[in-house]
Swiss-Prot record:
InterPro entries: Aldolase_TIM, Indole-3-glycerol_P_synth, Indole-3-glycerol_P_synth_dom, Indole-3-GlycerolPSynthase_CS, RibuloseP-bd_barrel. Its EC number is 4.1.1.48. Belongs to the TrpC family. Pfam families: IGPS. Gene3D superfamilies: Aldolase class I (3.20.20.70). HAMAP family: IGPS_B (MF_00134_B). This is Indole-3-glycerol phosphate synthase. GO terms for molecular function: indole-3-glycerol-phosphate synthase activity; phosphoribosylanthranilate isomerase activity. Keywords: Amino-acid biosynthesis, Aromatic amino acid biosynthesis, Decarboxylase, Lyase, Tryptophan biosynthesis. It catalyses: 1-(2-carboxyphenylamino)-1-deoxy-D-ribulose 5-phosphate + H(+) = (1S,2R)-1-C-(indol-3-yl)glycerol 3-phosphate + CO2 + H2O.
């Protein structure tokens, strides 16, 4: 399964990073960071309308290289100027061609919150996200225990961050809710085989109480898709490949927000 492979290479990468910088040193780096002055992501999600999380992504396991020309800073700035509510940055290098320095540089250059899009399997990676400018992390229910979901979310909040707790099945939505998730992501992509079913998020939306913001992820391509998600009561959409392939990124974000 692709997800198992992703977790395996993440463990190898984590061990390498831990050898390069100890957790104690990383904590010191985080402790010295200035206070974050970007808009609060959770408060923004609770405001009316459908919010857009625009993703900076060069490649994926299912599509390979999405774009060869990858001016990541210019892309992120265009998202920011177009009114994106947050910017997701892939930092997974082996399958997504991501890197932590993309996150750090983008976080320094944009006015909106940034999300570290990665496979968080250890508290070290949460401190690492914070040290590189992220104010949002992703916690994937399928790769974490119930205790980890709770502990990692609480650690993120202690560091002044928010966690999107991502589910793909009804059972995972239940686990996300039981863990105390304050933001839930419903993925249309099955991370085990990377197949996409756009209706997945629509089927599971009703499981989440209205007081908890919900983000629809993956397979969102058209204005019609966006309208369906808005009508179903989603608070936000995360869009990656569709934006990365577009030559009119600003116009596309504006159109999605307007039609919603």
């Amino acid at each position: 399964m692709i997800l198992d492979d992703l977790v395996a290479v993440t463990k190898i990468r984590l061990a390498r990073h831990q050898r390069q910088q100890s957790l104690a040193d990383l904590k010191q780096t985080v402790a010295k960071m200035p206070r974050n002055h970007k808009p609060d992501f959770l408060i923004r999600l609770k405001q009316p309308g459908l919010h857009v999380i625009a993703e900076v992504k060069k490649a994926s396991p299912s599509k390979g290289t999405i774009v060869t020309d990858f001016p990541y800073l210019a892309i992120a700035k265009a998202y920011d100027q177009a009114g994106a509510d947050a910017i997701s940055v892939l930092t997974e290098p082996d399958y997504f061609n991501g890197h932590l320095h993309y996150l750090k540089e983008i976080s320094q250059q944009v006015s909106v919150p940034t999300l570290r899009k990665d496979f968080t399997i250890d508290p070290y990676m949460i401190y690492e996200a914070k040290a590189n400018g992220a104010v949002i992390i992703l916690l994937i229910v399928a790769i974490l225990t119930d205790q980890q979901l709770r502990d990692y979310r609480q650690l993120a909040e202690k560091l002044g961050m928010h966690a999107i707790v991502e589910a793909y099945t009804a059972a995972e939505v239940t686990r996300a809710l039981q863990s105390g998730a304050k933001i839930i992501g419903i993925n249309n992509r099955n991370l085990k085989d990377f197949r996409v079913d756009f209706t997945n998020s629509l089927k599971l939306r009703a499981m989440v109480p209205d007081n908890i913001p919900v983000v629809a992820e993956s397979g969102i391509k058209t204005q019609e898709d966006v309208e369906k998600l808005a009508a179903a009561g989603f608070n936000a959409i995360l869009i990656g490949e569709t934006l990365m392939r577009s030559n009119q990124k600003k116009q596309l974000i504006a159109a999605f927000k307007e039609r919603a």
